[in-house]
Amino acid sequence: MYQQNAAGLAGTAFLMKSRGGAVRRRKVTRRRPTGRKTAARRRTDALRKAVRELIRRVKPRSPRQTGARSAPKSPESSYDFLRSGTPRYERDSRRPPADRVVMIDRESVWKGAQVPQPPQQPMWFPPWMMQWQHAPSRPCRAVLPAPVRIREEEGNAQIFKDARDVAEGNYLPRRPADGEADRDNRVRNRWSLEQVLRTLERIPARGRKLILTGLFGTAVGVVLDLLLGSPLNLTTRLVRLIVGFVPGGNLILNALDGLGYLMSRFPSNPLQITYDPGFQRLANSVQQNIPQGTAEALAHAAEQQVGEGFARNLAAAMSYLVGSAPSAAPMAIPLALVRPFRP
């Protein structure tokens, strides 16, 4: 057997001494079972005892049975709750008794009586029979989605616009009218100002007067009605020139330009725009912002460009207007005093 020498034992003892000495096997001392209880246990027992005593004092005692006692239950009667009240014929037999068989004669059938039928039970078919009795399903045709439409302008649109301006002689940059550069998806084909003026010249005089007076008021509407409906057949450029020089003329031109949105919705009957709520909002906005002397200045400019015949027509229109509508007399007085401004 291998045995260490003295040097080895000394080294081992030194190591064990440096680490705290050898590990000894100690016996675990166990406490002896005593009958003493802890203080917490004694308090708990005392509390339980007090609660039991309180319940015994408060709870009333059950009265004693003075009569004869009932016989003890037999062991069979303890299983009565397991027995069902269903008759035997319903539990063991599938056929109901004779008194429960429903018999209906011809008279009852004639009166509308029906035999109670059992509920329909789902039937099971093998898979091959299911495929046989159903028609073969036809595959649906694949519907290709419509291509996406991308709304974008052409890249060379500005080139064409510049060429058109050069051809027309519009070398200076022109400020577009309000609403001209807008994009409206609801109205694809918006009428231009020339098309609006041309349409107002061609429609009947009564409808034209109704649209213009409803949009610009009585005084300005009558003057514009005489300009557009005169037998002189004025061009749209001349009408725009006369209206453009007047204070508030840009507002009138912009309103007529905005009228192109409304007239494009009703191309067959332009008189329907008078019932449109957009037309009413436009008329309220224009009549609130138009200057006071626009009608007199417009009549003055038209008299200078057209001549003395315009003043006579205006006087006749004002006399008819005052006679038919007395409430329009204060607005017609300044226009009735307009005289030819020719030398």
Swiss-Prot record:
Compartment(s) of residence: Virion
Region (Disordered) residue spans: 18-100
Keyword terms: Virion
Main subcellular location: virion
Basic residues composition-biased segments: 22-41
TM helices/strands, residue ranges: none
UniProt feature, compositional bias: Basic and acidic residues: 42-56, 88-100
GO cellular component term of the entry, any: virion component
Similarity remark: Belongs to the atadenoviridae p32K protein family.
Name of this protein: Structural protein p32K
